[in-house]
Amino acid sequence: MSEEKRKMIAGELYRPNDPELREDRLRARHLLHEYNHSAPDAKAQRQEILKSLLGEAGNAYIEPTFRCDYGYNIYLGENFYANFDCVILDVCPVHIGANVMLAPGVHIYTATHPLDPTERNSGLEFAKPVTLGDNVWIGGAPLLIRA
């Protein structure tokens, strides 16, 4: 694991143009393309893609389209359901409990940027983890960030 990847996952300032991180994002994009373009009845294929993409997938069901940065920082509990257009920017870990339901258009962002313009212009970024407990339902089109 590169030092930049370690810092990213730990919530420290890191450089997102690190070669390993670029490759990880590309891998996720390929898997997401395959997932989002799968046939509506391809449940087994979708589950296999989620198992390859996510840190923990359980028996999740996610309606396409789904987007994330890396995938491996997303940990889903049992009986997770996300409706259309879910976005999880998983720069830091995202832990979601059991029996969680997300309505259409839910966005969960761990990524953020330094507030100081000099630091921000240097290209550094950081993130903070997000955790949702068990039995949560989130209505349509909210933006969840950890500030």
Where are these regions (language model features)?
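Terminal amphipathic alpha-helical/low-complexity segments used for targeting or macromolecular assembly
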Residues: M1-N59
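Flexible, glycine/small-residue-enriched loop-and-beta-strand segment within the central core
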Residues: F66-L76, Y81-A147
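Arg/Lys-rich RNA-binding interfaces used to dock onto structured RNA substrates
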Residues: G58, I62-R67
